[in-house]
């Protein structure tokens, strides 16, 4: 369960970085 939370956090950070790169 802990690794799932880590993946979720990484996904959120990656998504924010991707959106920032697109803008």
UniProtKB/Swiss-Prot annotation:
The keyword Secreted applies. This is Dermaseptin III-like peptide. Keywords: Amphibian defense peptide, Antibiotic, Antimicrobial, Secreted. It is found in: Secreted. Signal peptide: none annotated. Its main location: secreted. Pfam families: DD_K (PF12121). Expressed by the skin glands. InterPro entries: Dermaseptin_dom. GO terms for biological process: defense response to bacterium. GO terms for cellular component: extracellular region. Possesses a potent antimicrobial activity against bacteria, fungi and protozoa. Probably acts by disturbing membrane functions with its amphipathic structure. Belongs to the frog skin active peptide (FSAP) family. Dermaseptin subfamily. The keyword Manganese does not apply.
